[in-house]
């Protein structure tokens, strides 16, 4: 390699004292004998020798450039690029002023072409002009042709001193004999064969003037071999520069056999270095590195011993305590990784393990297979020259690189000697380890050619005259004049350009031998210039004489220690392991790149974090600028630095940008210039990432957008396309149309496939909530994909329907009745399995509830179906802990947490066991279904004659198992169309969790019917169903009013009807709103019985007769005719939108039912407290009603009695009569409220029907307050009562008109009605049935009329006297009547049954004043109004019902009982009732 930093002043100032020394390696100037014994008068050949360019023929050899100090140069043939042109430019013509005539005699450029010159006589054209000093010519013998090619140098005759220089063959071929025609006193140099193959023996004339030239000393030109111990060579020893070289200088163990295997985890260059290092530390006779020797090297890395121990553990795969080469290379590789910041792996990857183990196996095989002769060098055709007559010549290592597994070691080269014995041939080509065998006489004629190349042996000699161009001819460092020398850097063979034979005379192609340092492989073309590196100066012109020439690496005096030497390739097979270009590029990059070191980054980051107090990750400009200003740089520099740092021009610096700015500031302070543009090494990584992302976005092709595919999209490959949802007008219109189409086309199959929630099985409350969410969670704007999908689905469904399915055609031989029976059975199976599964789930729920009742837990479950959640357990634990602390304070004993946990565990285990039983039952049901489907599949395949259908397929397509809801609906439609005789049924969906029954699960939806006949039948069926539901609602309303009484008296269970009602009440919370039909059957007989029992135990028979199963027709008859009218009306109005709204209504009813359930639960909690009070109160009420009031026994009173007396009596238990009347009045109010409330949500006050019993409102305080507000107190006549009466009259008139009763005059007789209305409130529950008839149509009330008189005749008489006695001023509660009247009208209009239930009690009041039926009716309305008014008041709070004055209620009961009876039956006289208290 060439060292550009070393001066090679081999000028002629020194040649007077000594001939130029030939640095053939690291030790230049080894031979000085040539000039020491030669007279001064022979300067020309000496100077020619001194002026020869260094010809690096070794691996490391490089041409060295000389300085321009050649003032004393004699004749110097210029062999530069431009013939003699380089004389002026390179050396300057003035340098040759002493002997200008010799300059004219310089050799012309040397053509180094390939023209063979075996047959032409050699003409020395390098000295075309004879020297002017003839006296010196005898001593200056012409240089003999010097064969530097690969041919054999022939004998040359002596030539005269005046004879020009002979041709010098510098090619690679064996030189043919050069015919020299001149004789001279001093024999010229013989042609030297520098080729590769055998050189023919050259005729060497006897030496003449041998005293003038001493034989050359041994020259060591290699890098790693030990220099010869010679006194003059010691000061010129090479300095090993590098970690590897420091060990290599101690010697290499070349006996190690290392297979030529590449390790992929390290580079080839690193592997070569590691191999050299390995050879330097391995002892002789061993193939491994001992632990001690390896420790010396590894400890130099500076790593802590703990890490080195881990590396050793990983590398010592054989656990032998010693490392083979692959293990050693692995250790060095791991150390390098750690030094570069990586971590030591816990385990080697499999690839690395395999490579190391295979390498070790190869080493073991090579050791096992080698024999004693394996160490001998391979035999070559040149072995005969190795020992041929070499005397007193030391072996000279001329190679640069060590013996490695990548190339065969170079043989020693004998380069000097006074004998004509042949030098050992040396192979500089492809892996042939021969040595030079040609001897060279320095000063004696005829040096033997020396083989240095690898070209064929037939190369022609090259002429060195006539404008020879400078040329590098080999790779091994050799002295010119002794052997041809390559001054280039790369081997000349087998790398693409082989040097052709160069004749020394003739117009051949000139071959450039270098004008600059570090010449790359030569090209033999005339105008080809070698590449330059290191900006070296051009090689000076080169003489072909015997001047000493440095051909190896230069002395290490000025050698840079930072540039380790890299070996060079010497053969064709030695791949790029030793290429110098890799190192050069890396060196240039590393030296030129300006980077921020990790130490700087850590320091700058700390500074940044110190000033970034808010942890924003950014420094504002004032702070950053102030930090930069502290450096003392001028404003211009700081501005330039800021522009470079603030890359994004944000006025703020992040951490990386701040570190960059600080680095530039410190660089400027250290004398480095501020760059105009940031180099790539200083650009922050975050900026690079953003720039790369921007470039990718810019370069991404925008024309390759794919159309959106509407198939199934994989989540991994999904990429959103924003263009699909751009808000343009076209998209908006399409979205709206799609939405409207969905809403208006529920009957279309596409809509059914999407909106299938109305027909899915709803088996529990959770599923109901989910369906509500599904309906309400529709996206406001649907995308294109949804619309198109719906259209595609619809088109596919139509195509499927239009295709006839021949597989469904049964075999004609099978009777049609069998096929129809088969189809009917198959159609029934899904529903059957569904019912079985549901029933089993209900049984499971019942078992769980039964267990919980038998084993009540202190933990109250808040989960679905009363399950205990984790939150409940936490609350229970916290309560237990609190109780424990309180007990510790009070000294009481409480249950421990352990008992609580044990109880919880037992309950959980029991519930789990019950659920496991349910799971087993479900599995049994599944097995039965699979077996049935198997049999059915075989039967169907037999009947249709088609292929056998698998069990799973049959279950899937016939039973709908595992199908989407939309697909199941579509299959049902197909089946209904193909088999009209088969009833539609929804596919069976087994539920794994216990769920309550849903009667509506199997009901078809309106959208499923395609034909007009089916739709008409469906509408009729729905009308009937709604009629039944209305009846059920009416009965349920009545039952809800009495639920509290049933709950209070449920434990007493005096009669079976009460027990039935209680059981129905328990079932109700779990039942869905679609089970009203069941309620109709159970409620009708039970309600009247319950109502009569609590209030009047003496006359239960009378109410039961009309209401009991014997006379249920009477209440139902009036109700049924009224409801069908409404149902027909509803069917006409709601036929279009009933399907859409029916589901929502039912869901709302379900939610209301859940709320009622909660209230009923609250009532049950108070049942135990009220039971005893109610029993005593009921007894007292019955006595009073029997003795005093005959009219108070209306059916209304019994219903209200159970609920109201509890609330009223709980507050005022002292006054028995008042409590009775209070109980009566709130009950009536509650009935009135309860009836509209149970109309399924039309009355907003329905919520308080069940909650009235739980109210804690003070009834008496409310009554007194309202009396004062309404002016009902007779003593305090402030005029309010008159206004109230007028208001009541107006309200009554309005109500009468709206109810179509047509008695406004009688309605205006409010004075009587005002007072009795609040008191008579209990009547409505019994009368509801008759009044429903009167309000809706007067024809129907007849059957109901007998019921009220029988009940009313008894209680009214006793009730009337106590009320006026208690408080006579309570007549004015009229104001409440008008509000109630309106409510009654509303209720009556909405549901006539309810209105009828409320209205019957009022008529008794008008009968007192006028016996005519009309006033009675008006008073009935008034009464209802008052009653509803109380209900309206009480709807918001349960105590409003109780707030109605009790005394007024008694008077009204007396007066109102008779009119009611007269309305129904005119035989009842009003005279028995005392007149009402005076009206204001």
UniProtKB/Swiss-Prot annotation:
Residues covered by region (8 X 6 AA repeats of [ATVSP]-P-[LVI]-P-[SPQILA]-[VAS]): 1315-1377
Biased composition (Low complexity): 1-56, 80-110, 117-128, 136-146, 981-996, 1084-1126, 1195-1208, 1248-1259, 1309-1318
Protein name: Actin cytoskeleton-regulatory complex protein PAN1
Ranges where the record places region 2 X 23 AA repeats of F-A-L-[AG]-M-H-L-[IV]-[NY]-[DG]-[VK]-L-[QN]-G-[DK]-[TP]-I-P-[YN]-[EV]-L-[DP]-S: 328-680
Quaternary structure and interacting proteins, as annotated: Forms homooligomers. Component of the PAN1 actin cytoskeleton-regulatory complex composed of at least END3, PAN1, and SLA1. Interacts directly with END3, and with ENT1, SCD5, SLA2, YAP1801 and YAP1802.
UniProt modified residues of type Phosphoserine: 747, 757, 1003, 1180, 1250, 1253, 1281
Family statement drawn from the similarity comment of this UniProt entry: Belongs to the PAN1 family.
Membrane topology: Peripheral membrane protein
Bias (Acidic residues) ranges: 896-907, 1273-1285
Residue ranges, annotated region (Disordered): 1-147, 185-214, 737-766, 888-909, 977-1147, 1169-1480
